[in-house]
Regions:
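C-terminal cap of thioredoxin/glutaredoxin-like
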Residues: 2-33, 37, 106-154
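Structural alpha/beta surface segment adjacent to cysteine/selenocysteine redox centers
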Residues: 17-114
Length: 154
């Protein structure tokens, strides 16, 4: 049994606070403490998408952006907030291929640095290719909802 301390981090790829935590996690963890990440959809399908211009959402984003600036982390405030289930599914696929960490970082970067719509399969497949995953296999995995239940159940 592994007795190493473990931090469990629930996150969503469209949540500004999750992005900031992702960027700072390595620096914040004491030696010997590992982090486990679990998907948590802010707005799961079929709920309405978050209105990226909603005053409460915008205020939250601006607060996180201020904290990011203090930490010298560049961060955009995307005005479109897509559903994120497919992005979570792609991370789980990447984990099976030994590429979870780079895929996790790439998805966050695509949304919060490039402003990409990470709810689109073509955008996610391009991100998968950038980290070394096979495009056809990644698209097939996303098309058939292979990891849907794992995202919903986690």
């Amino acid at each position: 049994m592994d007795d190493a301390p473990r931090l469990v981090f629930y996150f969503d790829y469209v949540d500004p606070g999750s992005y900031l935590m992702h960027r700072q996690l390595g620096q914040l963890l004491p030696d010997g403490v590992e982090a486990t990440v679990h998907p948590l959809e802010v707005r799961p399908v079929p709920q309405e998408l978050i209105d990226g211009m909603d005053p409460d959402w915008t205020a939250y984003g601006r607060t996180v952006e201020g904290l990011a600036r203090e930490a010298e982390i560049r961060m955009a405030h995307p005005t479109f907030v897509p559903w994120s289930r497919k992005a979570h599914e792609l991370r789980l696929h990447a984990a099976e291929q030994g590429l979870e960490s780079p895929m996790h970082a790439e998805i966050f970067s695509a949304h919060f640095q490039e402003g990409a719509d990470i709810g689109r399969i073509d955008i996610l497949v391009a991100a998968a290719e950038r980290v070394g995953l096979d495009a056809s296999e990644s698209k097939a995995v996303l098309d058939v909802d292979k990891h849907r239940d794992r995202v919903v159940d986690l």
